[in-house]
Amino acid sequence: MSLILKLLKIINYIIHFRKNLMKKIIAAAFISIALISCKKETQTVTKIDPKTGKTVTVEVPINDSLKTGTASEKLAIIDSLGVFKQSFKLVKGDTYPLTTFQKDVQTMTAPDGKTQSGSSESTDQMTFTVNNFDKGIYDITINLLGKRSSQAANGKSVVIDTKTAEPKEEQLKMMWKVNKALVGNTLNLKMDESGKVISITGFDPIYTKVTASVGTLIKEAAQKTAFAKSFKESFNEKILKEQFTKNLVLIPSKGAKIGDKWTETENATPDGKIKLSTTYSLKSVENGIATITVSGGIPAKSDQKTQDGITRSMTSELSQNGTITLDQKTGWIKNQNIAVKTSQSETLSDGKQKQTMKSVSNSTVVVNPVK
């Protein structure tokens, strides 16, 4: 065989080999693409069951898992291996409500067994408008919108409402004037994403306005000074910081698992001898809502003193239970509904006879009442 023929055969062999190799490469590429496509259809992910808090493994479309991941990054209440943490993801320009409502029904039983009942209600309306969010700090305007209170007993009732005209009764005018001067004002709140209140400012103009509002009712300088001092002690940055922290930041900074409980204790009396304990438990995080249950109170306390031959014995007890719900997307409180029952009994005795008076108060404390 001539050299030329041998070269032609070798060239044909190389061409044939290359064609087969390209076919295999193309086939392999199609198989690879098919496999990648299959992998993109589903993906195994680990999730936390919101009801039980247990870790479960499920197959989900990869698009859905990606969407889930993106949504989780935007949520204010997120979980990491079953531990839920609360933050705030508020939107610039949006306004968030914080309306508090409390109703008390008290029944007193006299020593002769006769009973007398009375009730009272109070509503405070305010909203929070987000002005800006910069370097992890929210700039928020607190809008003081309205205050209403009412009392009813023995078939009679009185109402003080900033959205209605000034009451005619002299004893009610002062409270109405103070409340009327208070609403319509704004405060400025600086808060970080964790809910830590950095500052609340804007009190001085409100102090001036409220003090001036009672000028026609309080004429003596000493009384005006005493009133201004008392008002400042009940309405200031420290008081509002405590109120907002208590109402807005519910989940501990370390986080909580489904079923976890944590307890907070505060003084129920100025001397701190009686403590109020509140136990919270993370019940569930599902459908965009975190649900927290509330229980606790003040255990039964007894006190006895004798003076001038008269022994005075007193027992008291407080219990509370209810539910708080938070919006998972923003971290803001959606609703709170807590029932509080206070029982008190007082007995006077001279050793020969005794008289006992009992009092039972049932209260409902609601934040952002459901309309």
Where are these regions (language model features)?
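Positively charged n-region of N-terminal signal peptides that target proteins for export
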Residues: 2, 18-25, 39-40
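C-terminal motif of bacterial Sec signal peptides marking the signal peptidase cleavage site
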Residues: 35-37
